[in-house]
Amino acid sequence: KASAYIFTNAKGYVTIMLPLVKQHKYHVIFYEEDGSELFRIKTIKDAELILDKTDFIHAGWFSFELFEDEKLKEKSKFFLSRD
């Protein structure tokens, strides 16, 4: 099931949508397909954040863990296509 919070938009960019960002503290960890950590965003302060494809180095499947107030809110994955 696709995430309602972290997904690729129509242009292929990774989008983070957190409508309750003012009420909660969020952070996210992105992983390679093999489970190794790629990078993390320690504090998300904007309701919408668009990440550049170059942040992910290559096309393919990536997984993530989204935390709300230090509790795991969602664990999912997305596919990032080539240009």
Name the predicted role of every residue range.
Residues 31-37, 62:
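Short, glycine-anchored, charge-dense loop/turn motifs used at functional sites
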Residues 65-83:
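C-terminal tail/sorting-segment detector
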